[in-house]
Amino acid sequence: MADPILYSQALAHGRRIKGSVSKVRRVLDQIRGRSYREALIMLEFMPYRSTAPITKVLRSAVANAEHNLGLDPSTLIINRATADMGSSMKRYRPRAQGRAFAIKKQTCHISIGVVTQT
């Protein structure tokens, strides 16, 4: 039986980020598996609103790798990038004749993990 692969992974989480899960996942799918520098450049030029909180969580994951594990940022790649559904904020929009329509403002939880490139 082969030896298990041991590696150090640094994680960062962003909780209750405004935005739908599907809109965040379309950005995370493009940066998963890329190097840290390449992902930052891609996020800078993408035209989506969700890139700002994703960049913040990515920088936090790299800072965790530097501080907690002593890893070099130039050798890091993104091996885990997930978005899970968070709680929904319920709001009501007044409508005609005393009615009210419910509006759900969605949030999501972003998790990013980085490892060293081998």
Swiss-Prot record:
Gene3D superfamilies: Ribosomal protein L22/L17. It comes from the Eukaryota. Keywords: Organellar chromatophore, Plastid, Ribonucleoprotein, Ribosomal protein, RNA-binding, rRNA-binding. GO terms for cellular component: cytosolic large ribosomal subunit; organellar chromatophore; plastid. Pfam families: Ribosomal_L22. GO terms for molecular function: rRNA binding; structural constituent of ribosome. Coiled coil: none annotated. It is found in: Plastid, Organellar chromatophore. GO terms for biological process: translation. PROSITE patterns: RIBOSOMAL_L22 (PS00464). InterPro entries: Ribosomal_uL22, Ribosomal_uL22_bac/chlpt-type, Ribosomal_uL22_bac/org-type, Ribosomal_uL22_CS, Ribosomal_uL22_sf. This protein binds specifically to 23S rRNA. The globular domain of the protein is located near the polypeptide exit tunnel on the outside of the subunit, while an extended beta-hairpin is found that lines the wall of the exit tunnel in the center of the 70S ribosome. Part of the 50S ribosomal subunit. Belongs to the universal ribosomal protein uL22 family. This is Large ribosomal subunit protein uL22c. It comes from Paulinella chromatophora.
